[in-house]
From Swiss-Prot:
Chain residues forming the annotated DNA-binding region: 20-79
A UniProt-annotated Pfam family: Engrail_1_C_sig
Family stated for the protein in its record: Belongs to the engrailed homeobox family.
Name used for this protein in its record: Homeobox protein E60
Amino acid sequence: PRTRRVKRSDGRGNGGTPEEKRPRTAFSGEQLARLKREFAENRYLTERRRQQLSRDLGLNEAQIKIWFQNKRAKIKKASGQKNPLALQLMAQGLYNHSTVPLTKEEEEQ
């Protein structure tokens, strides 16, 4: 796979010493086709299967693991399904990610 190095600031916005950002992996068409085929067979890999794919595709195990995680997350997001526990907590008013502005009293505390 091809990777690229990207410099970024220290995150404080003051242009401090640049640090190395983890490079993004550009998978080849052959690697992607194989990963997609494996994913279609099973959404979760055993350690042994991940090691085999790593050898076959010339990728490290972390790259394969992250690809599978990202693929599962993408499908979950696209399906719009919510976690049953999250739905139950929302029904009870205990799970809400919306924000509301603080009152002056709350800001002063």
